[in-house]
């Protein structure tokens, strides 16, 4: 584990292994570098693998209550400074939104981009369909639960939305409690993604190829975001991981890793 200084202040924790062209992995909004543990073990030799890890204890980039994707992109810039060259950036879920933002605002920092079901909710604001209604409903019910102090119910619905009914209840109790403690510390971060400056116009400005990965069992939200990406990116590659839902770095790591390696420039 290494701590790196982040431009503008603070630090970011990374886990790294190997040598060669740098490949940087960004985790989901409720996860950590552990989401990439199996991918690291399966990745062929010849790359410098770097996973950005989560903040703990309520800390995080930027100012609490006023965080933006720029703060999370700052973590990527810290890694680029650390490795001394442009990186292949792979972002999952929240990390995918950060990767898209970085590609639009700092293309010189990147050698390539891959996004795995990025939660770029701002792309759905102009879409008149069930996907935006679904994610707004999930957000609003989550906030109602949290205001009432019902964190279990808030994340039971959230986790089940992305993993299937009954998923959260099947977690071991100790894992659930540790997860909820961590999420209480992180707080309400919905607006970071809903208000992100990721639009059809910013996507069209991205000149580099972007590898868009989705699961065959993607939610209506992730499928709609993927459609917006493929419609607006100038140079998009598209892969579908058969049988996978949103949490494919954990559930379908082998096929996902093969897909990512195969499309890496």
Q: Positions of the model-derived regions?
A:
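Active-site loop/oxyanion-hole signature of alpha/beta-hydrolase fold enzymes
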Residues: 50-90, 94, 258
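Conserved HGGG/HGGXW glycine-rich cap/lid loop of the alpha/beta-hydrolase fold
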Residues: 7-62, 85
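Conserved serine/cysteine hydrolase catalytic core
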Residues: 178-231, 240
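The conserved beta1-alpha1 loop
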Residues: 24-28, 92, 214
């Amino acid at each position: 584990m290494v701590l790196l200084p982040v431009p503008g202040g603070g630090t970011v924790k990374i886990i790294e292994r190997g040598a060669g062209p740098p490949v940087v992995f960004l985790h989901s909004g409720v996860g950590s570098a552990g989401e990439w543990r199996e991918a690291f073990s399966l990745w062929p030799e010849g790359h410098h693998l770097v996973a950005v890890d989560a903040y703990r204890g309520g800390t995080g980039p930027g100012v609490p209550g006023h965080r933006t994707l720029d703060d999370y992109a700052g973590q990527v810039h810290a890694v680029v400074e650390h490795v001394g060259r442009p990186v292949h950036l792979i972002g999952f879920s929240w990390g995918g939104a950060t990767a898209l933002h970085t590609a639009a605002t700092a293309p010189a920092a990147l050698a390539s981009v891959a996004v795995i079901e990025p939660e770029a909710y701002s792309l759905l604001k102009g879409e008149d369909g069930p996907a935006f209604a679904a994610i707004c409903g999930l957000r609003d019910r989550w906030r109602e639960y949290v205001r009432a102090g019902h964190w279990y119910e808030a994340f039971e619905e959230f986790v089940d939305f992305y993993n299937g009914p009954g998923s959260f209840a099947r977690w071991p109790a100790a894992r659930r409690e540790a997860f909820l403690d961590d999420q209480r510390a992180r707080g309400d971060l919905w607006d970071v993604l809903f208000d992100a400056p990721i639009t059809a116009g910013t996507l069209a400005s991205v000149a580099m190829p972007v590898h868009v990965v989705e699961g065959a069992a993607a939610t209506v939200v992730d499928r709609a975001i993927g459609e917006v990406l493929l419609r607006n990116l100038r140079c998009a590659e598209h892969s579908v991981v058969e049988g996978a839902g949103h949490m494919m770095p954990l559930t379908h790591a082998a096929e996902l890793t093969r897909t990512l390696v195969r499309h890496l420039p």
